[in-house]
């Protein structure tokens, strides 16, 4: 009886730990999807498909800033190899193999976002600010994101 209780308790603890790590993967996916949506909004404004909207620009930058602050905490060794449930993209194992390079990519993104804050006032300044942000996103995705299938 005691053995059954101990085994059951160990299984519950293990399942809880795995679920907590999967939550980090899911949070990362949500942040990336939010980034993508905001880049689409900013891109539409920059292309003249939508009118300039300072509130939308500020909201996007706020979300990018939050992502930049959260990203360093979302890739502990314990999530290596875990896949998101609802995405065709996942974290590349290179994140852990090339950690210093990955951390530099995150820092580049944070620097690009920080450089844009308070400087975007119209379409022209938006276009200028989007270039380094987009470049930082693209570099990291090219190096540290895997596509399934």
Curated annotation (Swiss-Prot):
Q: Where is the signal peptide?
A: 1-20
Q: Name one Pfam family in it.
A: Cytochrom_C_2
The Gene Ontology terms for molecular function here are: electron transfer activity; heme binding; iron ion binding
Question: How would you describe the post-translational modification of this protein?
Answer: Binds 1 heme c group covalently per subunit.
Q: Which key words are in the record?
A: Electron transport, Heme, Iron, Metal-binding, Signal, Transport
Q: Does the keyword Metal-binding apply?
A: yes
Query: What GO cellular-component annotations does this UniProt entry give?
Result: periplasmic space
Provide the residue positions that the database annotates as binding heme c.
32, 137, 140-141
Q: Does the keyword Electron transport apply?
A: yes
- GO biological process: what's one of them? electron transport chain
Function description: Low-spin monoheme cytochrome c.
Provide the assembly information: Monomer.
For this entry, the protein name equals Cytochrome c-556
Give the lineage. Bacteria, Pseudomonadati, Pseudomonadota, Alphaproteobacteria, Hyphomicrobiales
């Amino acid at each position: 009886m005691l053995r059954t209780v101990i085994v059951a308790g160990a299984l519950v603890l293990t399942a809880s730990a795995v679920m907590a790590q999967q939550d980090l993967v899911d949070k990362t996916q949500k942040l990336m999807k939010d980034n993508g949506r905001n880049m689409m909004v900013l891109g539409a404004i920059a292309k003249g498909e939508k009118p300039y909207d300072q509130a939308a620009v500020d909201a996007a930058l706020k979300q990018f800033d939050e992502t930049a602050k959260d990203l360093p905490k979302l890739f502990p060794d314990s999530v290596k190899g875990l896949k998101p449930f609802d995405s065709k993209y996942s974290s590349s194992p290179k994140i852990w193999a090339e950690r210093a390079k990955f951390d530099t990519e995150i820092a580049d993104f944070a620097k690009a976002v920080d450089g844009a804050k308070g400087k975007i006032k119209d379409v022209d300044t938006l276009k200028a600010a989007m270039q380094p942000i987009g470049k930082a996103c693209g570099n990291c995705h090219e190096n540290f994101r895997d596509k399934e299938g």
